[in-house]
UniProtKB/Swiss-Prot annotation:
It comes from Rana luteiventris. Disulfide bonds join 27-32. This is Ranatuerin-2La. It comes from the Eukaryota. GO terms for cellular component: extracellular region.
Length: 32
């Protein structure tokens, strides 16, 4: 249903944001 597809989109966005945050953290720790 609509809720399920919304959950799927939210998960995708959350994954994307988490990935970007992790990349920034890695840059701070190890340098880019």
């Amino acid at each position: 249903g609509i809720l399920d597809s919304f959950k799927g989109v939210a998960k995708g966005v959350a994954k994307d944001l988490a990935g970007k945050l992790l990349d920034k953290l890695k840059c701070k720790i190890t340098g880019c």
